[in-house]
Amino acid sequence: MLTRFGAYLAATAAEGGRRRVVTRFAVTSITGLALAALGPTVASATVFSGSGCAQVNIIVARASTEAQGQGITGNLATQVQNASAQTVSTEAVVYPATLNNYASSESQGVTNAKQELASAVSSCPGQKQVLMGYSQGANVVLDVVTGNAEVRPSTVVGPAPAASLSHVAAIVGFGDPGNIVKQAWDLGTDTSTNGIFPRSSAQLHALTNFGAAASTRSWCDTGDPFCASGNNLNTHLTYLNRYQNAAATFVLGRIGG
């Protein structure tokens, strides 16, 4: 039986120029609990093994505490692979995904995601790129566009260059701690409460300039402890139950089927 609540996570958040301490429950394993009620399942996709470039590449950043790899968000990537008429490759962002030392972990995620994106663009300049992330992974993939000043790392990681971002066809996130409500790219039931690391107006401007209203979808539901500063951990762990099909449809539309 899984232990639902492990250690407390103490995270600092800034609002209105002052700092506050927000205590949130952490989990011993997001993977195990989320898999217990996983959303739409799909058959295993055929891994792209051609000698050239797939037409589409999906870069996935896993949730906090998941083992290295794509985590549960890999189910969404696989669904897109299976449904697309194009060749689709996938890869995982290599980063700690830890709750302790969150800012350092997330910074490494943004840095490595930027490097993976740049490498893919360099190797396959005609390839459409898709970024997907869950929880801390969602924080990572949106911060590829904005930089990660909101998590207050010791050294802020800046956004990816325009030369890389111009190849990104879609970004999908679930339970992003950097969430700001009522943005054009926001979906889900939360319309009143920001995440525990809300992005600044400058970061929102970066997303707007990137074209996030068309290219990005970020799901956050009321009660989520991380994207909506709530107290319902189960809400945070079960986005794929509710939104996996919608996310797949969105990505397929952005990449051209």
Write out the residue ranges for each language-model feature:
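Secretory targeting and sorting signals
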Residues: 1-45
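Active-site catalytic motif of lipid deacylating hydrolases and related acyltransferases
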Residues: 48-128, 216-244, 248, 253-257
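Serine-dependent carboxylesterase/thioesterase catalytic core
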Residues: 111-132, 136-200
